[in-house]
Structure formats: C-alpha cells, structure tokens
C-alpha cells in the first residue's frame, strides 16, 4: 500500500536514481516551463483554442480588426472581417523535416462584403446586398511542441527582442554636445508605429522639436500648428505677475515666495508702517519673506525701471480703438509704458521667470519663432517634412494631421499609452492610441520642469524602459504589413463590385500576406537556425533575448552602458550568460523564473512578506513595480513560523543594495537560483567561480557534443532533470498507464481507464527518433528506459534523448582527474588523457552528414540517376543498387560514389572512327558525362538512411518504391498494435458483461437458461461472443453497442491507413526544373584525439595534447590510473575554484558508490543498505529523500544504479559547504583533504607530494580537429590573382603572408622563397610545368612571372601611370 501512496511523489526514472541534494532552501514554487515564453506568445497570436466571441484583441484577430473594414473610394461598398479559422497541417513535423517543407496550416478568413444602394438619397445609405465567404489567406507556420518552427525542412527559432518601450523618455546628452559641458535635456515620444517626436534644448536654452530626426524647428511652431496663439502658449507655461497703475505708481501683486533669492533693486518697506524690510542691493532671503508674510503685504510699489525689460504675458490692446500696442512676449520698454499711460491702460500682465527654477525657455523660443499664425506654422512643418514641394493649405493640414493624430499612421499601443501616462503624471493607464494636444503640452511641461531642476531624467537601460517583443507579436506585425498591402489592392477593386457581381474571394489576393510571413520566418535577423548541438543549447536559444534586429540596436552603435549589467536585471536577465565578442551584453538569456507580462516587461517572482513574516503567496513584479519595495534575499534566516530572525536584513530598494529592519520588508526572493539563467544554473559551485569564467562555462556547455553513451554528472545542481524534460528531446508520457510493448524504435502504452475521455483511444504510441541529423550535424537518437509491464504516470520520462541519462541532462563524462604537471604536456591549458578513454569510447561521438544529389531537366536533356556510369570501374559501383543509389549500411570513404548520375553533354561533331566505335559499342558512353554524388574529401562513414523524392507525375524507381513500402509497413505496425489493444479492451468489457449471465441461446453447446462461464467463453471464438443471446435486455443493448464500436474501429483503422498511404505515395512538390532528389545520410564516428577541444563546466577549457597509454599514466596505490591530467596553474589566476570543489565532491560521490557496490556484492540485507542510504541522503537530519516509499525491489534497483557513484546536487548559491564535502569524504572512507599519493606509471616511483585527485565532469566541445584540419596539393584558384583560395570550405591552401616572407628573407632561403612566391602560388605557367616535371620524375623548377605582379601593373596603370616590364 505504501508504494501506491508514493507513486505521485517520485517519477519512474527518479526512483531508479535519486540525486542527493545539499540545498538548504526548499523551492517554494516549481520552475515554470522553460519554453513558456515562446509557446505562450504564439498561442496568444493564434488563439486557436478560443471561441470567436471570446477572442482577445491580440495576435491575428487584432491584425484583422485593425485593417478591416475596408471601404471603397466611393463609400458604396465595404469588406468586413467576421472571424478566422486554421485548418489542419498537411504533414506532421517529422514529415516536413524529411520532405523539406514548412510545417504550417491553411488560414481561412470569413469575410463579409456589404454593398450599399448608391442611388438612394438617404444617409446612411441602405444596404443593397450582403455576401459572405471564407477566403483563403495563405499558410501560417505553426509552432512545434518544443517552441520551434520548421521552415523549408529546417528547425528555426524566433528569438525574442528586447527593444525600447514605446512611451516617452527624458534624457540629457551628458554634456557631450557643447564644449562648455552644459547638460542639454531632451524628450522623445516613441510610438509603437509611426513618427518619432523629439523635443530638445539647445545651448542657448531655446526648446526645439524634431519630427523623425529631421531638421529642428522651434517648439512654438508645433504649438502654433496645434492651434495655440502666443498668449495661450505663455499662459500654459508661465505663471503671471500682474501690475496696476495707481496714482502714477506701479503696484505689483505680491507673492513673497517669488522674490526669494533675487537682489532687491529698490528698498522694500511695509506700506502701513514704512518699516524697511530689505534695503536696495541686498539678496532677499527666507527671513525677509517671512517678514513680508507676517505684515500681510498684498502688493508692492515698484519703480518704473523695475518693469523695463520684463516680458508681457498678454497682448496689450486699446479697447476703445482695437489698436495693438504690444504683442504677448514683447519686452516692456519706456515707450510702451508711456503709450499705455496715454491710452488709459492701467493693468499689465507679465510672465514670472527667474534664473533658478522658472527659466524663460518658451518665451525665448517664441522670440526666434518666424511664424505668426497656425497656417504659417503648418507650412513650415510641411517644408521641413517635404522639402522642395510647393505647400498648399490642404496638403499642409493633411500632412500634420496624418503625422500624430490618425490611427492608421500612428499608434502608441497599450504599452506606450501606459508608460506615457505614468511618466507625465496622468492617473489612468488607458487612453487613445494617437497623441492629443494635451499629451504634447504635458511632455514639453515635464521637459521644462526637468530643466528647472524638478524631476529626474530616465535611465534608458532600466528594464522598465525596455520591453520584450516575442514571436507572436513580431508575426502579428508582419501579418499587418501584408494586410495593409492587400488593403491597397482591394480598395481599387471594390469600385467594380456593383457592376460585376464579385465575391470576397475575387477581391482579395492573399499573396502579399503569404510573402510577408514567409520573408519574416525565412530571412528575418531574429528568425535563426536553431542551435541544436545538445538539449541545453536548444533551450537556451529559445530563452534568448536580443537587443539586435529590426527596430533594435546595431553592434557598432551600441555603447558600454547598454551592454552592461543593470540592477534591474536581478531575477529577470542573467548577469552571466552572454556571448564573448562583438555581441557581448546585447544578447542575453532570461533568468530561470522570469516571464513577461501582458505589456512585454520582464517580471520575476517574489514571496510576499507581511509584518516580518514570510508567506507562501508568490507575486510577479516588473522592474517598474519593484522600485519602491524592500526585497530581501531568499537565504534570510527564518524561524519555524516564517518570521525573519535577523535584526538587520540585506535587501534591495530603489535599485540599490542596503540593510533594513525586518518590519520594512515587503517581499523576498523565491529561490537563490532566481538571478541566473538555465545554463548558469547547471554549474555546480557557481558561487566560487569568477564571473568571466562562469560566462565561458555557460557558453561552453551549449557546445558539448552528445556522446555515444550519455553519463549523468556525479556533481550536478538539481536542474538537470528539469532541463532534459522541458527541452523536448526525451519522450515524456502524455497519459499514465502500463507499458504494453517496447522496442528500440517505439513504445506502446495502454492508458489508464480514468485518463481516457470519451472518443479518445486508450492507446498511446510513441515512435522514437532514431539516428536523426540535427542542425549542427550531431546525432539525435532516443532510447527507451522503461520495460514491458512498467506502470507509469503522466509526465514520466519513457525514453532518453541525446545527452540525457535516466531523464537527466548529461552533456559529458565523469573522469578521474589529477591536478599536476606531466612532462610539459599540459603547458598552456593543454590536456593529456589516458588511452582508456579512447578505448572505452567515453568521448566517441556520432555526427550525421546529409549529402544531396539533384537530377535536373537541362537544356540538353534530362539528368538521370542510374548505375550505368561511363568510364567507371566495377569496384566503384559495388555499393550501388540497380537504381544507382548506395545501399544502407555501406561503409564509404572519401571519393566513393553515393548516387550515380549522368548529365547530357552538348552534341559534338564526330569523326568517322568515333561513329564506327559508337555503332559497335552502343550510344550511351559518349553523349553523357559522369556527375555522380561522391563522398567529399576528409569524410568517411556508414550510410544510415536514404530518401528519394520524385517529382509528381514521374515514374518512381525501384529504390523509391522500396522506401515507400518500409514506411507503409511502419504505419501498418502502429495501427495493428493500436487495434489489438483497443479490441482487447472491448472484448474484456464483453466478457465482463457476459460472465454469470443467463443465456437464451448461443453458439456451441450453450443451452437456453444456462449460466455463462469463463470455460465456455474460452472455448468459443471471440468474434462469436456477440452471437450469445441474453435474457437481460439492458445487457443485450450494451453488447449491441460494443459490437458497433468494434465495427467502427475496423472502419477507422482502414481510413487512417488509407490516408497515410495516400500521403506516402503521392509525388513530391519539387522546385521548378528538378526531377528527382536523393538525400544520403552518413553516420561518421569520431573518437577523441589530440587537437580536440575539451572543457569543464567552470570555463576551464583546453586542447588535448597527447593520448598516453594507460600503463604510463599516474596511478593510485590501488592501481587505478587517472583518466585525465590537468595543469594546476590553470586554477589560481583564473579564480574558478568551483572545479576543485567539484573534484572533491565527485571523489566522495564515487567513493560512496563503491561502498554501496561492496555491500551489494556482500549480499547485505535491504535494511542495512537502506540505513546506509539514509546516512547519505538525509545526512543532516532533514528528510530530503523519502526512502520509506520504496519496496525492497525498488530499493535494490536504486542501490544497483548507484554502483557507479551517488549523484549529488549542489544548487547554485545554496551549495555544499566545505564541512559537508569533508563529511561525505569521511562517510566514503576517503581522506578529508581530497589528496592522494600518486605513482608515476613509467617509473613506479611516487610523486613527491600528494595530488588533488577526484572526479570532474568534462565535456567534448563541437570544435573537432577533423573539421578543422585539411591538406591541399592542387585545387581551385582565385580568378583575379590566380592564387589558391583560402579555407577548408574552398579546399584552399595556407597563406604565406608578409611576415612569413620576412622570416625566409632573414634566413636567406632564396630558393625556398622563390618557390613559395611563384610555382607554389600564382605563376600559372610555372606551376603547370613543375606538375608535369614531377610526374616525369624530374624535380627541376622553372619559375615565371607571378600573376599578382601583373595585377599590380594593371592597378598602377589604372592610376594613369604608364608602366611596362622591360625584358633584358
């Protein structure tokens, strides 16, 4: 019973091998699916599972809604969008990869055409006709279950983009623009779609505006264009001071605060008492202002000079005559004051400015503004946007309106509006998508406030100002681009609707939409060839966020600040994982727990803390919401109730790290690994490594090649199982049940009754991927890890993929490592390895190469794939079948023919002798040439698969037919198994119904009235059970139903087989002019050898320098030779001490495994073994692994699996302490310092000092010497210089450059130098001669003129200099 209870606690694979964890913190929440960012984004884009009425305004639905309805120019007809539905994909993912197709589904959109009665005089016009139709709008690529797209047969990933969020941003130039170092402030309104609007100060403190980064204009031109007059502009931006003329004296309304800091230009008295408050020439201070307020002064008498030079806030008009005496923003002069007195104007409004916090910026800008009216301003903007075009009033108005105020041309988006409103202090987060007058005013006001010292500029690199644009959103944008193109074409055709009785299908051409989508997935900078070296590289690629790409940054322009780690990256973006090189900091990886919210900002989870007590409630916070919170780290000490124990807690607040009291804490981190990405979270003892080395370690794990036999790391972090299951490379059970059948290529599961719903089959068949080529030519192969009869749960791992071992990620091998020098062979990070590693195939990898042969239709005739090839010996054709295609299983080497192909030659005039020979020996030989597919140089391997694709309508050859037969046999096998299980299920239910029932008759010896027994049923054939007649009518009806189910089952299976058959035997849709394509897959086995690159997980990389025989390797006293020797000098300066700790813990893990193996060999009781395992797993009294839930068989299986070592998990930032490592070493009876005396294998002498020996997890990286090294004798030459090409891909030579020439000159090696620069390089005549001479056995050299010298002569002549060679 205990076992049944424990089923949900541990998965099938976990129970076979537990990982001992040292983590002190229990993870409060499970790690979310690692691919969720991709899957959710595209799910929201398609909304396939949502009803039409419930669809949100996102994705496809939003794109259609924004473009439709489309009205004709006359307004008499319009197209409306009703809804859409996606069809079923024609081929599944596997077939698309094989056939080179795109995995996509047809999109059909319901469009309604509404025609109005144009002759009617009513408004709105009555509807004359409505036509509805489903219109095909092209194919939409579908995302696979693992977050990738299959485009033209290759797997691609669309990387998320981190771009500037729409909204408004305020910044300054950091004093770089002007020589004085003055800060010039600017504001920029960034829309999601449309023109950018910039406001900026110049060194003279005038405010300018730019539209789309064009020529700048004074900002008041924009304000005038919006309909504001000078008076309105000044009243919006300035406070006013009013002055009255009373009895020949000027009185200003006194607001004492405004005088603070000014120097009094006259004595200030209290009017009633005459008391002097400030004397002339003194600065007015806060004390003076208090006195003024105390004496309740309402106004202040000022001398006339005080007004001179002040600026008017309003126009001054003589009300009796209507005459303008002065305009708003004019300066007050002596003449103006006289004129006002003469006209009886007793009141003046002036703008209030000071040098400190009320600058006269807008007033100064108005002074340089050349326009005087709205029309002039519009014309000025028109001239700036369209230089050279003659402006008209209508054109200028339309242009300005279209810039920011029309939804089709301008969209801030929901994010932009939210960011905009929050920044300029508008309460609501919602509003129109276009700009309003008030928006523009509020931005200018905020900018001026910042210039006046109120408020701060924004930090562009803050993650609250950068948002993630994922796949769905980018696809939607492309889709909208396509729809807008369609809209233009449709508008023109809509005018024909009334006359020609057209349907929606006739109006809409879906090509532009398909083209836009195809272009995005095929050639966008963010749609990338998936990194598929191993499961981790795939997961990381999908979780990547890039600042590059359309609408993003470029490498050249990105500065240091953008690339740097920012405080808001905490828990959102990994501070470690980023590429080395020009993209450093521009391409990042999401942290383990991070996700994006509805606005696209990255959020990280936090536990809520209430009154110093931590709760289990988890909230996701974005960088904007986090600023004002106090957030503690996850390793804070808590008591049993969750109260924080410390008096002062380190926390994050306002993007800074500080100490605070527990009562202030609002939130706490969820987990210590929350700040790092998936790759970094796989590095044990990450906390002991330098950041630069951790970066290399993260990146190099992604380059690890899957080995022949995957081996789990002895020292891991506990993330291995999560990465392996989420990556999609292993097979995970969709539903629980019992394993019915297992072989190397498929698993059949009989599903639990409670997990099958009506109409679903009770069988799950998993076809495994066998020896499939990845994008990087590594091998994808799945192996079952379950046995027939095993009971499994939903989510259990059924089969391991590449780089997985028992459902855990396994990128490399555990090797016995010694840190010591060894005869200089590990100088400069070189590595020396034991021959045993090569012999045991520890690092043998399989690489699969795809070679393609295409038969085309040429002008001279068709190419043919055949075994009948001219001038080729019998031995060369020994691997080909009668169709001319290589057999599967053939061992081939460089130069061997894989596919025989002949190409027609052009007709040549034949001599009589040739004609005679042709008449005797037949036609074929001479009019075709051999163009067979051969194995490229430097490659050898085994043919593991051949695919033949034939153009539709052409006769298939024998090989193509046999491949089809194999395919059909596989389909048939699956269907037979499924049918068998479902039939058994039906018959089981029938027997259950019939047993012990009273029969009224039936086949065989069944008498009416007798009871049905099991013996009777066993004797009668199953098919005849339905002929038994039962007294009970209800049972008879159930029997009838089951009989119908059986019939339906037969029909369903036949239909499914016929559908599959049709798909398999149909011809292929090949490119124009292509008749047949043959793809040959070669498996190349690569053993590890000197020159290959290896690395640990801590950035400790090196190249193998030598493979040493086992007997020469250093060995321990018990005779165990070490596998690998590393240089100890590689540790201290690199500061990656994690590798040493890993080595110690690895030794302990192996030692514990050895002890368990010893106990098993001594046949000790399960209780004794369980007691020892309890010591290992639950060493500190905390029950981490519940061994009580295992029965004896399961316990012994577990112990058996631990012989090779007890796997350990030391989570990042929460790992094993030094003391814990020592206690594990002692438990395994090993020295606590982890050092061992080693003996030199060659001499038998002990080394002077004990050496650090232990187990380290080493990876073989995808930088193999076989792929890099090549040799050339003769080959292709560059056209212009006639020098050999460079690089392996071009079969090129080595460059003998300038410095190499100097070296030979220094040695005086004249003949060698001459040979290098002539016959070995670009002396065309000389190299032909020497080749001939060598063939004849004559090794003399006759050098001529190098071709590059002739090129030099030509270049000099091109400069107009006459130069010739003079021959003596």
From Swiss-Prot:
SUPFAM superfamilies: beta and beta-prime subunits of DNA dependent RNA-polymerase. Changing residue 537 to P: In strain: K69 / isolate 8844 and K91 /isolate 8756; rifampicin resistant. Keywords: Antibiotic resistance, DNA-directed RNA polymerase, Nucleotidyltransferase, Transcription, Transferase. It is an enzyme of class 2 (transferase). Its EC number is 2.7.7.6. One of its GO terms (biological process) is DNA-templated transcription. Belongs to the RNA polymerase beta chain family. This is DNA-directed RNA polymerase subunit beta.
